[in-house]
């Protein structure tokens, strides 16, 4: 005989089981919703990129909308979009492409990366000289070699072998900047103490205690795109930090830092003080957080909060988009907030979105 108490317990057990089944059903639905949302809900294609470089957004969007150049449509969007900044550095704060961010020797060098979400293929160039469309060379590294990153003069050699033109990246603008910087005692710089270099001796009293990172010194175009087929690509192009020590490679060509994307989840890209930010693999981390179901905005905010715990003065920003077409961004130590660009098929034109505290 089953006592009243026992029956009561059975009811509770059954109710609990039922509850678990219902909860399981809903969490499975939520899971399926996260990973299999139909394309028509997403307003694809979609592209986001850092800063106000809205023509790059438009070019990326139009490239995808018109069906791309190759079958990797989102990647074509990334390449053509970033190419726009590389060809028009004056419209991209001189932080991408030629004619900007000279190093201690007055040279402009380029960093770039692309990633294809369906296969996780990556190609990148670092500290590349004398070739303008760096992101296109990065794509060649990905598609024509088994390597991931080529750097320096040999990246240039590779680019020339691939048919790219060799050109000066310095201009009268960078030459003038460099002269002024030398005349002002080579401040700021990235050394931690007095040092001798080929440029001469720098004494303690001539040093900037902290290098100045900010809007104009240190940024990048970082871009994430999802094409009509739901494929995700991401990429970055940058001319690095102004007055960098020759040889310095920034975060832009470092996969997981400059950008990262997974077809099942979405993608993220970053901009800012790359020397510090690359220590956290922020773009990869944001994508992994989104994979766990986190909204892109919250993922970016958590990542920025973590960096600030270790480097309270680090300046920069992260943008992200998930497979549902939800976007998010977060920034740190940018006094005027952080602008980024968005275009999707629900919008007549690209828009600049500025986040501020
Ligand atoms: C975008 O490109 C057009 C020319 O195609 C140019 O007139 C305009 O100034 C550019 N806008 C920005 C914000 O760079
Ligand atoms: C760029 O720098 C190189 C090496 O210093 C120099 O030969 C060249 O004339 C410069 N080009 C421009 C446009 O200033
Ligand atoms: C730099 O070189 C000078 C001699 O030219 C030497 O006295 C000094 O110790 C050197 N400083 C450093 C930091 O190496
Ligand atoms: C951050 O900047 C403040 C103000 O310039 C300075 O006092 C502080 O030492 C800096 N902190 C670090 C960790 O660099």
Q: Could you tell me what each predicted segment is?
A:
Residues 1-10:
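Short, low-complexity, Lys/Arg-enriched N-terminal segments of secretory-pathway carbohydrate enzymes
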């Amino acid at each position: 005989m089953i006592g009243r108490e026992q029956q009561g317990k059975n009811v509770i057990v059954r109710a609990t089981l039922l509850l678990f089944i219902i909860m399981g059903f809903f969490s499975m639905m939520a899971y399926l919703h996260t990973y299999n949302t139909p394309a028509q809900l997403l307003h694809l294609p979609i592209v986001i990129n850092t800063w106000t470089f809205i023509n790059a957004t438009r070019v990326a969007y139009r490239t995808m909308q018109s069906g791309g150049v190759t079958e990797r449509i989102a990647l074509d969007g990334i390449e053509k979009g970033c190419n726009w900044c590389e060809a028009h550095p004056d419209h991209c704060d001189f932080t991408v492409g030629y004619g900007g961010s000279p190093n201690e020797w007055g040279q402009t060098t380029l960093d770039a990366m692309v990633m294809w979400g369906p296969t996780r293929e990556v190609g990148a160039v670092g500290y590349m000289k004398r070739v303008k469309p760096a992101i296109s060379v990065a794509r060649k590294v990905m598609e024509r070699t088994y390597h991931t990153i080529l750097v320096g003069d040999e990246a240039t050699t590779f680019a020339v072998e691939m048919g790219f033109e060799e050109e000066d990246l310095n201009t009268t603008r960078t030459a003038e900047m460099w002269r002024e910087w030398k005349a002002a005692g080579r401040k700021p710089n990235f050394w931690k103490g007095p040092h001798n270099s080929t440029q001469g001796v720098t004494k303690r009293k001539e040093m900037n205690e902290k290098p100045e990172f900010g809007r104009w010194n240190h940024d990048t175009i970082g871009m994430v795109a999802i094409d009509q087929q739901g494929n995700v690509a991401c990429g970055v192009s940058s001319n690095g930090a102004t007055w960098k020590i020759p040889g310095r490679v920034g975060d832009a060509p470092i996969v997981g830092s400059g950008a990262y994307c997974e077809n099942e989840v979405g993608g993220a890209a970053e901009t800012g003080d790359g020397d510090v930010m690359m220590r956290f693999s922020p773009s990869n981390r944001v994508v992994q957080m989104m994979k766990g179901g986190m909204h892109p905005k919250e993922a970016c905010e958590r990542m920025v909060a973590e960096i600030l715990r270790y480097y309270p003065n680090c300046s920069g920003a992260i943008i992200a988009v998930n497979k549902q077409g939800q976007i998010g961004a977060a920034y740190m130590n940018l006094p005027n907030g952080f602008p980024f660009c968005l275009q999707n098929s629900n919008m007549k034109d690209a828009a600049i979105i500025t986040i501020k505290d």
